[in-house]
Design a protein with these regions (language model features):
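Active-site loop segments of alpha/beta catalytic cores
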Residues: 1-142
Length: 142
C-alpha cells in the first residue's frame, strides 16, 4: 500500500510536521490494526512525500517499511540520514532520464546503485516520480 503526499515538498518543515506528518503517521499506525481486525494479511507500506527531503529524518520514523525518494536528493545523503533504521528506500532516478540515450540511462542507474551503497539490500530501483503528462504526448524512444 503506497501513500502519496504529492505536495509535501511545498511545506516548510514545521508546516509538514503540523499538517502532513500526523496523518501519515495515523495511516501507518492504524492500517495494520484494521487489517488484522478484518482478518486480512498485512501488506508492505510505502510512503512517498514528494520533495520533502528536508524532513526525511522524521519520515524515516513514521513506521513505513519503504520511503519513496524523488530525484532531488542524492541516494548517499538519504542513506546517511536513514542511518541504521530498518527503512527501505525506493527511487530515485529522474524521470526525465527516459528522454536520454541508452548510455545516459545506464549511467543514471549506475550512479543510483552506487549512491545506495552498491548492494542489493535496503533500496528498490525506481523513478523518483511518475511519468509526466508530456511523456504521454511525446514518449521516450529508448
Amino acid at each position: 500500500m503506497q501513500v502519496f503526499d504529492s505536495w509535501a515538498g511545498e511545506l516548510s518543515p514545521s508546516t509538514f510536521k503540523q499538517f502532513s506528518e500526523p496523518f501519515l503517521a495515523h495511516i501507518s499506525k492504524h492500517l495494520p490494526i484494521r487489517l488484522k481486525e478484518l482478518g486480512l494479511d498485512q501488506v508492505p507500506m510505502i510512503v512517498f512525500p514528494k520533495g520533502a527531503n528536508q524532513v526525511l529524518d522524521s519520515v524515516c520514523n513514521l513506521g513505513y517499511h519503504v520511503v519513496g525518494l524523488d530525484w532531488l536528493i542524492e541516494p548517499s545523503e538519504a542513506v546517511k540520514i536513514r542511518g541504521d533504521r530498518p527503512v527501505v528506500f525506493q527511487g530515485n532516478a529522474d524521470p526525465g532520464v527516459l528522454y536520454g540515450t541508452e548510455k545516459s540511462i545506464s549511467e543514471t542507474v549506475e550512479q543510483m546503485v552506487s549512491g545506495f551503497g552498491g548492494g542489493k539490500k535496503g533500496w528498490i530501483a525506481n523513478l523518483g516520480h511518475g511519468r509526466s503528462n508530456i511523456m504521454l504526448l511525446n514518449p521516450p524512444s529508448v
